[in-house]
UniProtKB/Swiss-Prot annotation:
One of its GO terms (cellular component) is small ribosomal subunit. This is Small ribosomal subunit protein uS12. With S4 and S5 plays an important role in translational accuracy. Interacts with and stabilizes bases of the 16S rRNA that are involved in tRNA selection in the A site and with the mRNA backbone. Located at the interface of the 30S and 50S subunits, it traverses the body of the 30S subunit contacting proteins on the other side and probably holding the rRNA structure together. The combined cluster of proteins S8, S12 and S17 appears to hold together the shoulder and platform of the 30S subunit. The gene is rpsL. It comes from the Bacteria. GO terms for molecular function: rRNA binding; structural constituent of ribosome; tRNA binding. Pfam families: Ribosom_S12_S23. It comes from Sodalis glossinidius (strain morsitans). InterPro entries: NA-bd_OB-fold, Ribosomal_uS12, Ribosomal_uS12_bac. Belongs to the universal ribosomal protein uS12 family.
Length: 124
């Protein structure tokens, strides 16, 4: 335990909080260009072909971003918007692609949870 004199000389230092999404530079979203669009398999016990893309961001970072929803139109050189949010069963994937923004289309025939997939309200 430090004495009061020691604390006066050198106060206790605060812990620095480490960001889970360093590539965003404390921004809500970032724009980037797809450099590679591919599928990858999740870790045990899950099994699937998850759609992901490698993105070169405007600040120079190169990150892996998950493409949510059924079907997508992304290819190399597509300009997309990414947000934070990791995918628990894909190691190294800490960002999500924002559907319905820039070159990324919304999910076709989506009726519920539309706002998360960039889909407008259907005509009645």
């Amino acid at each position: 335990m430090a004495t009061i004199n020691q604390l006066v000389r050198k106060p206790r230092s605060m812990k620095v909080a480490k960001s889970n999404v360093p590539a965003l530079d404390a921004c809500p979203q970032k724009r980037g260009v797809c450099t590679r669009v591919y599928t990858t398999t999740p870790k045990k016990p899950n099994s699937a072909l998850r759609k992901v893309c490698r993105v070169r961001l405007t600040n120079g970072f190169e990150v892996t971003s998950y493409i949510g929803g059924e079907g997508h139109n992304l290819q190399e050189h597509s300009v997309i918007l990414i947000r934070g949010g990791r995918v628990k069963d894909l190691p190294g994937v800490r960002y999500h692609t924002v559907r319905g923004a820039l070159d990324c289309s919304g999910v076709k025939d989506r009726k519920q949870g539309r706002s998360k997939y960039g889909v407008k309200k259907p005509k009645a």
